[in-house]
Amino acid sequence: MLPSQSPAIFTVSRLNQTVRLLLEHEMGQVWISGEISNFTQPASGHWYFTLKDDTAQVRCAMFRNSNRRVTFRPQHGQQVLVRANITLYEPRGDYQIIVESMQPAGEGLLQQKYEQLKAKLQAEGLFDQQYKKPLPSPAHCVGVITSKTGAALHDILHVLKRRDPSLPVIIYPTSVQGDDAPGQIVRAIELANQRNECDVLIVGRGGGSLEDLWSFNDERVARAIFASRIPVVSAVGHETDVTIADFVADLRAPTPSAAAEVVSRNQQELLRQVQSSRQRLEMAMDYYLANRTRRFTQIHHRLQQQHPQLRLARQQTMLERLQKRMSFALENQLKRAGQQQQRLTQRLNQQNPQPKIHRTQTRIQQLEYRLAEILRAQLSATRERFGNAVTHLEAVSPLSTLARGYSVTTATDGNVLKKVKQVKAGEMLTTRLEDGWIESEVKNIQPVKKSRKKVH
């Protein structure tokens, strides 16, 4: 008896086509790691090879437009990581993969982990601009988290000494490469936040390969940077090196030297600002003196215009005209005119202006002297305040204390040594002098007994 519904009957071509479509649509693009064997490159430029492991193998093809982007020549026995599409070669029914990209297995796996972690943290919002903390301006203390023997530390200290020698720097030494490095970097960031000595941190190292920089692609380091209350400047490798730490940090600097430039002030620029302020002060004083002098000249001119001698000269002229007119008067008026002249002469003598002129001249001289004294006193006080400010700045500079022969010694934990009981034999010490640092090992500890005061 025949079944009620006939089963589907495939031709070979349709079967292979159906299987190919299933593989391409269901599997999609995958990452595969394996060992290369049977590698060939015909005249077409395409690559044909087999990927295998200990128990299986699969045929692979990588077309010319894709293999042009590969930066190395595949070798027999080489471990690689490929991104490929699974398909079926219909004419022979051979299952194979079409490779789109290829990387050496080590770097390829690291790159894959990098992309996965980057996508994860970005989805959580750790890269968002709203969480970026502004850098202090100016910074009062800089913390540096890096290897104490690396070139990055030397570059940072060199730039800071050149730009702002008085800026305090605290070093939190840590490994920056190897399995223990991520944990040490995290502890250094947490320690800097606990001690709260700095207002900005530089976290970084010099350049290297992807494996060398991998500590700064560690999720623990990224989350420690994000959680830091102190603003963090990342300075990992060269300008072309980009790590997860760069995305999480509050600011990314292309190199350690550039990070030092960002967090420091240019002392030469500060000096130019002081000089500019001094020039403006001198110009203001010159303007003030010129204005006072002009005002004094105006007052002096007005006083001259109202001088009693001028009034007397005008009256004298009028008197002469009257005398001329009286000389032509009638004889009967001469006596009366003479009497009137005598009366006028007496009144004029009683109103002699000389004492008033003398008092006015004395008052003017006093005003001139007081004005000169006030201007000299103000100029002297301004110069004295400026000199005191410069002297005070030089006196409070930490480098001035070091220049007088003093030094500061810190233990391995970064604490400043005040007593011998803070150290033990064999420990390493760091001594800060005027022109650099000295690292030394404690060989012997000799306490000094305090002298007893004599009782009288």
Swiss-Prot record:
GO annotation, cellular component aspect: cytoplasm; exodeoxyribonuclease VII complex
Catalytic activity, as annotated: Exonucleolytic cleavage in either 5'- to 3'- or 3'- to 5'-direction to yield nucleoside 5'-phosphates
A single BP term in Gene Ontology: DNA catabolic process
Function: Bidirectionally degrades single-stranded DNA into large acid-insoluble oligonucleotides, which are then degraded further into small acid-soluble oligonucleotides.
Organism in which the protein naturally occurs: Shigella flexneri serotype 5b (strain 8401)
E.C. number(s) listed in UniProt: 3.1.11.6
Record keywords, A-Z: Cytoplasm, Exonuclease, Hydrolase, Nuclease
Quaternary structure and interacting proteins, as annotated: Heterooligomer composed of large and small subunits.
Entry similarity comment: Belongs to the XseA family.
Record has Nuclease as a keyword: yes
Protein name: Exodeoxyribonuclease 7 large subunit
Subcellular compartments: Cytoplasm
